[in-house]
């Protein structure tokens, strides 16, 4: 089935149909196979792509750059310290300048309104590499990864996101599950559940696709029978360590442990994480946390036992960022 996604933005997946999302996933699968077999054909020769990063990144930057190079495109990396964006020049003006020079723009930053403004004024496709509200390229990678690790049709796959569900991962996993007719469960304390407006929108999508949506504080209910357990960091890197105590106490019952995974009752259950993950105290941040909260020395949102077990497929997710991002660029620019 063919879809024309030429010159389409990727801002949140709200405005993509289920069929368009599945087309991108199938294209990513084909591009991945071509890369593995050495038969990939560069379809973006002569294209120039600007990568705006107001937030630092490993996976997103590398995925966009390698995907672009594989397809013959050129990229320019722009960070806050090497441009006038937001200092002497508005995003609206930046969009109108870069749109004259580049064939597409990627943005990774804070507010969803900023990437929407870029899309409104650039005159070229804009791709959301992450905002506080949504993380669409991660969602495509997550679903591709779940497809690879399950022999079920999408509509039969059951997954749970557990932890702080107010963030871009909680929002986006709820959205794409609703769009694709999946069984999606969001498990978080009441204060950290997705906004009611987003939930209502996803419930409407679910009525059209047959998705099953569960939003609950009950860990037992949420994990029963799931195929995949997703989580993310509990505290943003910008927040001072002193403020972590209340959040940690609130989320400790939602830590992904071997016992939690076993409560799924599924011997094939897999663990997923968009990374980076605080699963030990080997990083600078991990050491500081372990000093202040010794009971978390073996992991914060996920324990070392789960992360280093065969259940963990987070590195497959990380690789699939590249393949799905490549699919987005090829579909929009080729």
Curated annotation (Swiss-Prot):
Localization of this protein: Cytoplasm
GO biological process: arginine biosynthetic process via ornithine; arginine catabolic process to ornithine; citrulline biosynthetic process
Gene Ontology molecular function terms on file: amino acid binding; ornithine carbamoyltransferase activity
Gene3D superfamilies tied to this protein: Aspartate/ornithine carbamoyltransferase
Class of the enzyme per the UniProt entry, highest EC level: transferase
InterPro entries per UniProt: Asp/Orn_carbamoyltranf_P-bd, Asp/Orn_carbamoylTrfase, Asp/Orn_carbamoylTrfase_sf, Asp_carbamoyltransf_Asp/Orn-bd, Orn/put_carbamltrans, OTCase_ArgI
A Pfam family hit: OTCace
Domain of life: Bacteria
Function: Reversibly catalyzes the transfer of the carbamoyl group from carbamoyl phosphate (CP) to the N(epsilon) atom of ornithine (ORN) to produce L-citrulline.
Protein name per its UniProtKB record: Ornithine carbamoyltransferase, catabolic
Source organism of the structure: Avibacterium paragallinarum (Haemophilus gallinarum)
Gene name linked to the record: arcB
């Amino acid at each position: 089935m063919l879809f024309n996604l030429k010159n389409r933005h990727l801002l949140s997946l709200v405005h993509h149909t289920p069929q368009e999302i599945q087309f991108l996933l199938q294209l990513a699968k084909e591009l991945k196979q071509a890369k593995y077999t050495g038969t990939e054909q560069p379809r973006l020769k002569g294209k120039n792509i600007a990568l705006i990063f107001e937030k630092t990144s490993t996976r997103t930057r590398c995925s966009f750059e390698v995907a672009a190079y594989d397809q013959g495109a050129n990229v320019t990396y722009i960070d806050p310290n090497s441009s006038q964006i937001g200092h002497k020049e508005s995003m609206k003006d930046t969009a109108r300048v870069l749109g004259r020079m580049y064939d597409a723009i990627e943005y990774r930053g804070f507010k969803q309104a900023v990437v929407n403004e870029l899309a409104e004024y650039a005159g070229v496709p804009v791709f959301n590499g992450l905002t506080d509200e949504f993380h669409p390229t991660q969602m495509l990678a997550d679903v591709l990864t779940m497809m690879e690790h399950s022999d079920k049709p999408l509509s039969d796959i059951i997954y749970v996101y557990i932890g702080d569900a107010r963030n871009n991962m909680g929002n986006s996993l709820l959205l794409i599950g609703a769009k694709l007719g999946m069984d999606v469960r969001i498990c978080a304390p009441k204060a950290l559940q997705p906004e009611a407006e987003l939930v209502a929108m996803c419930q409407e999508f679910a009525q059209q696709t047959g998705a099953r949506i569960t939003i609950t504080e009950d860990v037992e209910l949420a994990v029963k029978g799931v195929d995949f357990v997703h989580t993310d960091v509990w505290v943003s890197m910008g927040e001072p360590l002193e403020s972590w105590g209340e959040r940690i106490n609130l989320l400790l019952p939602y830590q992904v442990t071997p016992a939690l995974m076993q409560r799924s009752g599924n011997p094939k259950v897999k663990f997923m994480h968009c990374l980076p993950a605080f699963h030990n105290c080997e990083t600078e941040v991990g050491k500081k946390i372990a000093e202040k909260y010794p009971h978390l020395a073996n992991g914060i949102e996920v324990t070392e036992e789960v992360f280093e077990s065969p259940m963990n497929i987070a590195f497959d997710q990380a690789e699939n960022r590249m393949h799905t991002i490549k699919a987005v660029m090829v579909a929009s620019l080729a």
